[in-house]
Amino acid sequence: PGIEYLQGAGLMILFSRMITLSDEQIRPVIEYLDSGKPIFAIRTANHGFLQNFPYVVNGKPVRFGEDVLGGAFRNHHGNWHQDSTRGILVEAQQGNPILRGVVDIWGQSDVYRTYPEGQALPADCTALVYGQPLVGRNHDDAPNPEKEPLPIAWTKTWTGQKGLPARVFHCTMGSARDYQSAGLRRLS
């Protein structure tokens, strides 16, 4: 309901998960992706549209998570419902305005793997925060030594069919309990 309001929106905020929309319902989303306006995506948005995503740019079908957001859910990198996540700010991005005032990120959700093992975040993405899986579900639990930190927040630029660049921010944390973290609220 209300998807028609996306046409006049100045920002699209997505917190979707495996939505299947009719051609008529998905049209405003595709039109927005061509608008050059910013996109803000939270947690499961990277697998928000798995079915019926009829969007093509330069003759190539667009994969929403991978192409638009910079990474799609591939697996739980942490132990699902057993680990929690400590956010680690990327040193080289300390001056980024998105990180201004962000000091402590922690959440009970686990880290998502958004690219194949042995690879990295796509080159057109700028990692802002890495997520270190912890060995439990408490703020002060130790890092899981068997799990490397993976990007959990990044920016990129998306260019749709009209050639208009759009700024994209994606954070793979974002469950309700994650937002008890003042650092994550500040980031998002």
Model-derived features: positions:
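Structural motif
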Residues: G10-F15, H170
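Conserved beta-strand scaffold positions in the cores of enzyme catalytic domains, especially
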Residues: I39, A127, V168-H170
